[in-house]
A protein has these predicted regions:
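Aromatic-rich carbohydrate-recognition surfaces in CAZymes
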Residues: 63-67, 73-77, 84-91, 156, ...
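Acidic/polar, glycine-enriched structural segments that form the non-catalytic walls/loops
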Residues: 1-7, 13-15, 22, 115, ...
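The feature captures the catalytic groove of carbohydrate-active enzymes
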Residues: 141-143, 149-151, 213, 229-232, ...
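Active-site core of glycosidic bond-cleaving carbohydrate-active enzymes
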Residues: 394-438, 461, 482, 486, ...
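Non-catalytic C-terminal accessory modules of carbohydrate-active enzymes
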Residues: 21, 41-43, 49-129, 136-140, ...
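Solvent-exposed, conformationally flexible loop/turn segments
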Residues: 276-279, 826-832
């Protein structure tokens, strides 16, 4: 068995039968990624400003040459053997399918750290590939580097020295992006400097303004290298044969001249001698720089282009990372100089998280879904603003605009990268909300066009008000609140316009309510109702903070009335239903998107008496925000019990699903909506037969908050069993596209189980009085909290591992609270010790 890294944590182990679907994204926030496949292969080159599933891109692969003493040398591709199916029109279809690989391979991960172990009886070395990209909470720049770090560890278990070479090869594909384009004038050159040496890939034939223009680099920190800038230009696959023969001869490459090519392949070889019983490491950096990102909503103005090739305004939005680095070589030099520190900071985070006492499935669900932040789902424009698709199609983004009703559910951004969350809030309120209070639930870019979409989603808009409260609390930024408040107030007041969501201003949404299931609900229902109640509570608190007492009182009055009405009229003894009510007056402009019912006298696509999986999503969010109960506490708990009873399936063999399939056969799941007592509309709410992980996590986390721990954990475990590497990719939970944003609701399980809450406004932190080691993060600082029993009391060690934490109060909920005489500042590396007595 090949040894694993001594200090890198591992959450999940995947054997050779569970590798086929693994593709771990390597790259930074807003940079795109190259994925590490389960066999140790590089795939899905999604670095050219768009998704590109299946795109071979640089056709990169790494090869080991090894000679033990006087024995014949062996050469192997540093990948596990190919798995069936092998069939294709011209034989096997994998890249370089005929080359020999390692017979034994396994994958081990705790995102972003991945380890691939290789062994083969014919190879005198055991090999471990260690791959990662820096991920540091509260440091989006350190977590946003366009690099894949690949470290090959060679271990000699024999009794003679082994001469070894690890060689990486990379095709210059600049000009292609996986969907189209043309690579022209590729130019590869060997460089050395800044602690690295290797190949710099550029182009002389692609327009520098094109979205597909950029640079690549393959470098190493190893001192002894040989290279080949370009494989020879000949037919019949002779270039691959020439490369293989050259390396296999003596483990070194000869840089022979080659005729000019548009897509030259370059190779970089690093050499080392591995002593008997010894271990040597060779580190490679794959870096990229494609600065010309285009808007997702191309302007149709004359001269504006289509958004695919034009590199000028109004369609170019650029990439923030490209403002931090001049080209791919600059990325390599700057990363190499900080590599030790970046790895240490990433390790500090991942180790602290993995060593916490959270259940295994919660750690895995929370950590694996952080990969979505680095996928093409998310990006940062040149001005540093953060945006996101809903998810990614195979070749294009899916559902543009930082869609409010989807991004409402996820919690990872706010609690790990608070500055990015604040960027979203500023765009939503200061750019996407018009003077009347209508918030476009999809943002057009550049931000000067943010209101062009011009349609509002009831759940999306209310959720953004709750998120404004959450992010104000986490940051403690009163200036931000005052800046956002006029538009926050307008966004809530928009509910009360004639023909609006709550035109009679009674705290209950009855109007035309577009929502996250892509239709309009007509009449009161629990999903829109709880988002609205949560927004009223959040606005009540924010209004009080800015000195708007009258508006605060209005919000409070409508919250009380709405809460009582929903409990009295929608709760059926088991769960909350929708009371379908066709519109009786003209619908206000901007509320009807057009994807729902066309005949409004008996509207289709309603919930009716159904049991909706996320019917209490607003209450879930209220718990995250610390806003308390929006509805009767016993009704809330009973509803979660009913969702588990009616929507959970121990298998799906008999389940008929007419839409997308994200779970099937022997898999367990929570269905979107069921009709346990009949009454299903002929055309019910869309997706009702489906399964989607973001909704499952929302319900599961809410169960955890309500004390239904075994039920919540069972739901989370059911999700993660479906993403086991053999059935699906553990690092890609799909919904409307790959790497779907909503799935990061999984992070909220960390909050629910630890009871973590932080207010930067009151400088107060709280945890549940639960023994163990807990991980915490507020988006601006992070660390651990250890709670240990001493007789009838509890000893607390609050440690800050990153950022600076300011505190006036610390509490263990329903146990004890400590109030400090002055503000305590706890910096990274410091701890606070407290002795707390139970009541």
């Amino acid at each position: 068995m090949v040894n694993l890294h001594k200090t890198w944590p591992v959450l999940s182990h995947y054997d050779q039968q569970h590798l086929a679907c693994i593709a771990l994204p390597l790259g930074g926030i807003g940079t795109g990624t190259v994925s590490l496949g389960g066999r140790g292969n590089l795939q899905d080159w999604e670095i050219v400003n768009r998704p590109a599933k299946g795109f071979a891109g640089g056709e990169a692969f790494f090869v080991l040459y090894a000679r033990a003493g006087g024995q014949p040398a062996v050469t192997r591709v540093l990948e596990g053997v190919l798995q069936p199916p092998y069939e294709g029109a011209f034989g096997a279809r994998a890249l370089h399918h005929g080359l020999p690989r390692f017979r034994e391979c396994a994958f081990h991960a705790a995102y972003p750290f991945s380890q691939v172990t290789f062994a083969d009886p014919d190879v005198p070395l055991e090999v471990r590939l260690e791959a990662f990209n820096p991920l540091v909470p509260a440091d989006a720049d350190a977590s946003g580097i366009p690099v894949a770090i690949l470290r090959y560890v060679l271990r000699n278990q024999g009794d003679v020295p082994v001469t070894a070479t690890v060689c990486g090869s990379l095709r210059n594909f600049i000009g292609l992006d996986g969907q189209g384009g043309e690579a022209l004038g590729g130019a590869n050159a060997f460089r050395e400097g800044g602690g690295v040496r290797g190949l710099f890939l550029a182009t002389t034939g692609v327009d520098p303004n094109a979205e597909r223009w950029g640079t690549l680099a393959l470098t190493t920190t190893a001192p002894e290298v040989s290279y080949k800038c370009s494989w020879p230009k000949v037919g019949w696959d002779v270039p691959l044969l020439h490369f293989w023969d050259d390396l296999s001869e003596d483990g070194r490459l000869e840089d022979t001249p080659s005729a000019p090519q548009d897509t030259p392949v370059g190779s970089l070889a690093a050499e080392v001698l591995v002593a008997p019983g010894g271990e040597e490491t060779l580190t490679f950096l794959l870096t990229w720089h494609f600065p010309n990102r285009q808007t997702w909503t191309p302007s149709k103005e004359e001269g504006g282009g289509t958004g695919s090739e034009c590199g000028c305004a109004p369609n170019r939005v650029g990439n923030y990372y490209a403002t931090q680095y001049s080209d791919a070589w600059d990325v390599a030099e700057k990363t190499a100089s900080r590599l030790v520190a970046l790895e240490a900071e990433t390790l500090r985070f991942v180790s602290a998280f993995c060593e916490s006492d959270l259940p295994q499935v919660v750690k895995e669900a929370a950590l694996c879904n952080l990969s979505t932040l680095r996928s093409q789902t998310c990006f940062r424009t040149a001005d540093g603003r953060f945006f996101g698709w809903e998810g990614c199609g195979d070749k294009v983004g899916c559902c543009y605009g930082s869609c409010t009703h989807v991004w409402n559910y996820e919690q990872a951004t706010a609690f790990l990268f608070g500055d990015l969350a604040l960027s979203l809030r500023e765009v939503e309120f200061l750019h996407a909300t018009n003077e009347a209070g209508l918030m476009s639930f999809r943002v057009t870019l550049p931000v000067g066009r943010a209101q062009e979409f011009g349609l509002a989603a009831a759940d999306g808009q209310m959720g953004c008000i709750m998120k404004a409260y959450r992010d104000w609390q986490l940051s403690g930024d009163d200036a931000l609140l005052h800046r956002l408040w006029p538009k926050v107030k307008a966004a809530l007041s928009f509910c009360w316009v004639p023909g609006g969501w709550d035109a009679d201003q009674d705290g209950v949404m009855e109007g035309c309510q577009h929502n996250t299931l892509d239709v309009e609900y007509y009449g009161p229902n629990p999903l829109m109702g709880t988002w609205y109640l949560g927004a009223l509570r959040a606005a009540e608190e924010m209004a009080c903070a800015v000195g708007d007492g009258a508006f605060s009182a209005t919000c409070h009055e409508r919250f009380i009335g709405g809460s009582r009405w929903l409990d009295a009229n929608l709760f059926n003894g088991e769960y909350y239903e929708q009371r379908v009510a066709p519109p009786q007056e003209a619908i206000a402009d901007g509320l009807r998107v057009g994807m729902g019912a066309q005949e409004l006298r008996d509207p289709a696509f309603q919930i009716g008496p159904g049991c909706l999986v996320d019917q209490l999503a607003g209450q879930y969010m209220a718990h995250v925000c610390g806003l308390g109960y929006l509805l009767d506490q016993q009704h809330v708990r009973k509803t979660l019990e009913s969702i588990m009873k009616h929507n959970f399936r121990s298998d799906l063999y008999g389940h008929a699903n007419h839409m997308r399939t994200f779970a099937l056969n022997d898999e367990q799941a929570l269905l979107m909506c069921t009709y346990p007592h009949g009454g299903r509309p002929r055309m019910p709410v869309p997706y009702f037969t489906e399964v989607m992980t973001g909704f499952e996590y929302t319900a599961a986390v809410h169960m955890l908050y309500e004390g239904l721990e075994s039920e919540g954990l069972r739901c989370i475990a059911a999700v993660r069993r479906r993403y086991d590497g053999a059935r699906r990719n553990p690092f890609d939970e799909a919904e409307c596209g790959h790497h779907y944003a909503r799935a990061r609701a999984s992070w909220a399980a960390v909050l629910a189980l630890t009871g973590f809450n932080y207010s930067g406004v009151e400088l107060a932190m709280a945890f549940a009085a639960r023994e163990g080691l807990h991980f915490w993060a507020n988006g601006h600082a992070w660390g651990t909290c250890s709670i240990e029993a001493e007789k009838r009391d509890l000893n607390v060690r609050l440690s800050v591992l990153g950022g600076t934490l300011a505190l006036k109060r610390f509490a263990l909920t329903h146990w004890d609270e400590v109030v400090f005489g002055a503000v305590r500042l706890i910096r990274a590396g410091e701890s606070l010790l407290l002795h707390m007595s139970g009541g």
